[in-house]
Amino acid sequence: MSPVAIVACVCLAVTLTRISPSEAIFPTPELQNVFLGRCKDYEITRYLTILPRVKSDCRALWTNFFKAFSFKAPCNLDLGSYKDFFQRAQQTLPKNKVMFWSGVYDEAHDFADDGRKYITLEDTLPGYMLNSLVWCGQRDKPGFNQKVCPDFKDCPVQARESFWGTASSSYAHSAEGDVTYMVDGSNPKVPAYRPDSFFGKYELPNLTNKVTKVKVIVLHQLGQKIIERCGAGSLLDLEMVVKAKKFGFDCVENPKSVLFLLCADNPNARECQLAKRYYRIA
C-alpha cells in the first residue's frame, strides 16, 4: 500500500509513517483514551459515505486490541496476535479505490484526498485509530509499558511487524477491482519496488482473485534525478510478479494529476514550468 513505510513492533515502537527505530521508543501517553477518542471520531464523522461502520463498539475493539499485546513480554508476539482484532474491525472496501504506497506517505495521502479519490490503509478504522501511535506490552500490571518501549530491531521480524503486517494483509485481502500502487522513482538508496517492503511481503501476496489489475504510479520528485522508470529495474520485476499472479498491470510516470499536486507546493520547479507550457496552464 501502498504504498516512508509501517512497522509495528510489538515492542510496538512503530508508526504508519515507518520512522526509524531509534525515533520510536516512547509509548503514546493515554493510549486507551486516544484509541477510544479516535474510534468515536471515526464512527461519527469520518468517511461516512465512503466506508461502512463496523459492528463492534469502540470499547469492545479496545478490549480486543489490548488483549493482543498486554501482559506479554514486548517481543512475544507474532503475525497472528492481532487476528481477532482485525476480524472485528474489518470493513468492506469500495471497488477500484484501494491504494497502496511505498516511500511516498505524504504524496499518496494527498493524492488519495481523504478517501474521495482512493482509500489507503490509514483511512480504514484500524489504520485511522493506530496511525503514528506507539505501544508495547509488559508482563506486570498494568500490562503495558507507559514509559519506554524497546527498539523494534531487538524484536524478531514477526513480532515487530505483528500489527502493521497483519493490517496490511487484511487490507489487501479486502481489495476488489483495480488497485493502485504509488512508489518513489527518485530514491537512489531504495528501489521503487522491494520484495521485502510491506507491499511486497504482505499486500501483494494477499490480493485475491477479486482484483483485476495493479496500476502503478511512479512519482518522480521535483528537481531530483529520475532513478526508476516503468518497464525497467525493480518496476520490471514488479510487473513480472504481478503478471505471474494473473493480474493485469499498468504503469504510468508522473501522471498529470500527480504532477499538478506536486507543483502546487513548488510551482517554479523546472518540471512545473514545462508542464505549464505543455498543458497550456494559465
Curated annotation (Swiss-Prot):
InterPro entries with a match to the protein in the record: ADP-ribosyl_cyclase
Protein activity control: Activity is presumably regulated by its sequestration in vesicles before egg fertilization. After fertilization and upon NADase release, it could then be regulated via its potential phosphorylation sites.
Tissue-wise expression: Ovotestis.
GO cellular component annotations of the record: cytoplasmic vesicle; plasma membrane
Biological process terms in GO annotation: positive regulation of B cell proliferation; single fertilization
Signal peptide residue numbers: 1-24
Catalytic activities: NAD(+) = cyclic ADP-beta-D-ribose + nicotinamide + H(+); NAD(+) + H2O = ADP-D-ribose + nicotinamide + H(+); nicotinate + NADP(+) = nicotinate-adenine dinucleotide phosphate + nicotinamide
Gene Ontology molecular function, alphabetical: NAD+ nucleosidase activity, cyclic ADP-ribose generating; phosphorus-oxygen lyase activity; transferase activity
Cysteines paired by S-S bonds: C39-C58, C75-C155, C136-C149, C230-C251, C263-C272
Subcellular localization: Cytoplasmic vesicle
Keywords: Calcium, Cytoplasmic vesicle, Disulfide bond, Fertilization, Hydrolase, NAD, NADP, Signal, Transferase
EC number: 3.2.2.-, 3.2.2.6, 2.4.99.20
Family: Belongs to the ADP-ribosyl cyclase family.
Record's function text: Synthesizes cyclic ADP-ribose (cADPR), a second messenger for calcium mobilization from endoplasmic reticulum. Might make the Ca(2+) mobilizer nicotinate-adenine dinucleotide phosphate. Does not have cADPR hydrolase activity.
Protein name: ADP-ribosyl cyclase/cyclic ADP-ribose hydrolase
Native organism: Aplysia kurodai (Kuroda's sea hare)
Phylogenetic placement of the source organism: Eukaryota, Metazoa, Spiralia, Lophotrochozoa, Mollusca
